[in-house]
Amino acid sequence: MQTSQTSLQYDHYQGAVYPLDLHADPNHGQFRKTHIKSLVNLCAEYIVRDASFTREAVQHIPYHLSVALMQAALLDNRDRSMETLISHWPLNSLTLKKLAPSLFTSVVPLYNSTYLTDIVRQSLRYTTCLSHTFLECLKKRTPTKLKYLDMTGFPTAEVILFYLATHCMLAHNEARQTVMVNMYNRVVNLLPDQTQSNESSPQLMTADTTIPDSSFTVKMDAFVTSDQTHAELCKALKVSGFQDSKLKIVLEKLDATCLGEQKLQILLQQINPKFLQGLRLKYNALSCEDFCKLSPVLERFDRLTALDLSCNNIRHKDSCDSLAHLLSFLPHLIRLDLSNNRVKTRLRQVLSNMTSTLQYLRLVACGLALTDVAYLSVSHHISGLQELDLSENNLQPAAANLSKLLKGCKSTLHTLEMEDCKLRDDTMEMVAGNLASMETLMYMNLSDNSLSLSVHEFVMEAVVGLPSIQAYRLSFSKDCYSADIPDYQQVMRKDFCVGQMYRVMRNVRGEATLPHLIFVELERLDYVE
């Protein structure tokens, strides 16, 4: 059970709410490029190798060099040195994304699930260490000056969210206790002196406090899926809105999964809309009626730039009307995921009233009809689209409109995914010319479409000739599969297919760097002619 939950969290840190810096290089593990380090960075790297050495150094170095030490400790995962640095942090604030290398970069996470898992683990390591160490420093009354911890841009594990929320409530309850104790002591001081009588004088009381008497703020990206964390977070967000709260939690992104409409209503009402920029409500089993109830609450979050409503049940006219009304209230929204909501024939109704232009649009398994693709090809969003995913829709009947759509976004589109779109040879021959004219395309996914080897070669020639292409995901050609041949011959055919693809790629690219090819099985064998 624990393993599946962990896997679920890793799978969730991607998509609309977690944008990739596609133009930056991979920044983790074997993919990370080595850069020439400055003398300051080399010295900092040496110091943080030993926590005791770090503890000695922070007593003498100028405060601005603490930043270099923290950067080195984060980069090399020196947890004990990080603890020392936070306990002696000389500044009022610490912003993680200014210190740690950005991990959500390049197109690699789009096709390499192992790499995605690695960068999420590394991100969770950063936020876990900082959160725990920060609270421990407060409880131990260390000489840190840190009052504002910003961990946005890096995922926070649900267990850490629960840990922070419980401490937020602990600080609130202790503050209330302190107020009551002070009131009691004032009353005791006003009582007449009992020394001349036989009665004993009331004793003054003291209040124990875990956190210093000041105001501290933790800003983060939260993931919540359990009832226990949901309940604790709702209470913590409620008290965080009080002006005199000692420990406040602020959310910039929220991923709320498997909670349902009623719990979402309660949670969303506690969040300050001033700060929330990304919201993911995937797998909440929202029916049409549920979404109509939830939509007015969502309209509060007018600063959202990313919204993920995938894997719910938004399909009928009323819910699509509510969705369209909601989107018209989100002027800054540029990233949207409606996957696995059957909005067939209603895409114009949903997207046409938006005041903003979408840069990211994911419509996987939405049952798109020809009219939907036709709308997309002429909509105001086409001028700004950078990432588009139309996978698991039958695009074969919409070949002409698909060609028009690709032509309209040829100068802006960076990633294009059309996996399992039932595309056949004739359609791909038609759109290959459009693919060859894509000016900024970096990643394309055409896997699980039933294409012959000759058409694969034709499309390959168009795609790998693009100057910006970095990765291309495709299935083996349908020629590789037949019920009449033994397994070893299928393997030979697949090897031949791979060889032909690389031959075409080398003929087109010459001595230039070759893009990465990802071959996968053609799963939909029932579509093979």
Regions found by a protein language model. Give the residues of each.
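A structural signal for leucine-rich repeat
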Residues: L164-H167, A236-S240, L264-N272, F291-F301, ...
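Internal alpha-helical scaffold/solenoid segments in large eukaryotic proteins
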Residues: C288-D290, L307, H316, N340, ...
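Cullin-RING E3 adaptor/co-adaptor recruitment helices
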Residues: Q2-C258
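Positions within ordered alpha-helical repeat solenoids
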Residues: E45, R49, Q71, L75, ...
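Short, solvent-exposed loop/turn at the beta-strand->alpha-helix junction
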Residues: R49-D50, Y63, L75-R78, S131, ...
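Short, flexible/disordered secondary-structure transition segments
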Residues: F53-V58, D76, R80-T84, L96, ...
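Conserved hydrophobic beta-strand positions in leucine-rich repeat
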Residues: L94, L149, L247-L254, Q277-L281, ...
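C-terminal capping region of solenoid repeat domains
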Residues: M1-L22, P26-G29, C409, L413-H414, ...
